[in-house]
Each structure stands twice: as C-alpha cells, then as structure tokens.
Amino acid sequence: MDDWFFSFVIFVIAFFLYFHVQNQYKTSDILEIYEYDYTDNKSIQDTCALKQPVLFHMPDHGIVANEIPSIMSTLFIKDIREYYKPDTTVVEPIVLKTSSGIGLLSSDTRSSYFSQNNIIQSENSEKFETLDKKLQPFLNAKTYYDVLFGSRKAYTPLTYHMYSHRFFVVEGNTPNCGIRIKMCPWKNTPRLNQHKDYENFEFWSNMNLFRGDEEKFKVLDFVVNPGYILYVPPYWWYSFQFLDQSSCVTSISYSTAINVLANAKEHALYMYNQPNLQSNIMREIIPEINDVTTNDTPDEHLEDPLPEVDEHETPPEENQDVSLQLIEDLKKSQ
C-alpha cells in the first residue's frame, strides 16, 4: 500500500512539473496586441498567461533620462550596424562612463548607437520596488533589471527572450517621445536567420524591420507612448526604435522557478560559453564577492578597444563624423 501511494505521489509531481514546463514553451501566433486596464497583480498575470502582447497605462513608474546617472556608473553601448555585417555572430558592446556614453548618444547623427544590458544599481531608485509589487509573478526566482535608450531614431536588433515575463516601461520628456515597436510571432523563425549568442545570452536576427525586411512577412507595428507598459511574451520577436533622445525604456524580466527549470539547458550553455567560467560561477553563487571585485578594478572594462569602422559603410568624409570623433576622444580621456 505504501509503495502504491509513494508511486502515485511521484506520478502527480512529475505530471505537474511536465505540464508547467511545457507551458513555458507555449506560443501564440495571433497577430494582435491586447489593451488592458490595470487593476491588480493577479489580473495582469492572468492576462499575460494568454501569451499575447499586452499594453496598459501606468504613468510615472519608469526611469527617466535624468535619473540614469544615479543608477548606472557605466553604459554598455552597441552599434546597430554591427548586427548586419556579413558573418557576424557576436556583437560586443563599447563600455563607457555614463556621462561619456550620454554625450556619445546625444551627438550621434547617424541613429546608430543604443544602450542595453546595463548594470543597474536598483537600490538607488524606489521605482523598481514599486514595479515589482505590481508586476512580479508568483514563485518568481530571479529578476533582471535594465534601462534601454539610444540616439534619436536608433533601433534595437530583432530579438526574442525566454523569460516567463518581460515588461517594457516607457518614459520620455514629451507625450510623443516613446518608442515604435515591430513584432512578429514565433512561427516566422525559420525565415529570420536566427543567431544564438550564448556568451552574451542574446538571441537575434539580422533581418532589419526598419529597413524594408518587414515587407517579407506580417508584423505588428505600433507606437508606445510615455506612461505605458508593454508586456512582451516569450518567443515573440521584437525590435523597437527610440523616437527621441529622451525616450527611456525600463525593462523588467522575471524568471519563475518553473521557467528556470525549463531553460536549464540554455543557462548551462551560457555558463559554459563564458570566458572565465569560475568567476561567473562565483558571480551567480556569491554576488557580494563579485561586487567587491568589480569595484576594485573598474578601469579594466573601460579600456576595451573600440570596434573597427568598416570603410565601405561610411563615406570618405568619415573623419567629420561627430559621433565617431567623440568616441575616440572619450576613450582617450579615460
């Protein structure tokens, strides 16, 4: 009798885990965005379970441009043109001090540079805690904060995520300085030339939805104004454009315990592809040790060489490019 009961319990647990893990891989192919009036946390979780993009109004909850220096000491900046070069598999960021990075973005006349995957000092702003209370799912295991912004009309590569929830909180200085976003469902993946960069845990496509490639398949194309929050479901491709230099997007991503289990293979490949596996293990297990280490040697990351500029992509008068000149000056000054 005891053996039968024990086997039954094991079966129920296994079935429960299998059902919820499979739900993490569930996708929707309906090309629609849902508009929602926020009421409480449970209601938003039920809506997000439909695996559709959701847009709702929640003003004054995201980071604005003038708050960036208080929560980030350095910026990771990328050149969108790097993603569309032949044979590109990894796009490394330029690491600059916050003031230098903001100066670069403000002088960029080519709409090429944007900042993402930054190290956020969330304790310096109460907004992250407030957003967690309103958006965090049940049994959340890990939270990832980021703030994304760029030069005017710059855009991010076409990408997707595997977190259980990802919210983009849009803010800006004027009512019309939000983001323009283009999305398409997972069923288009075979036509998108997918790239998996496990070193940076970035999954992207070299299809450019802001330069004509969106005509090859149906996409959602809409604008998110300041004061709104967009929920992007896992395995939905998306790329967004900053409509103004003051456009600022607070990204909050949640991984529940089941989501971590479902993506264990991907996280293992991420750890395996790190240049220094031992130090990254220490970062995950004992983050306090990593904080001390990074504070002692901040300049090591600030002196990384800049990516070479492709002469075929820039006109002969490239030496007059204000943004490129500024990068060189900023790096020398550091």
Language-model region placement:
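N-terminal accessory scaffold of Fe(II)-dependent oxygenases
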Residues: 1-229, 239-334
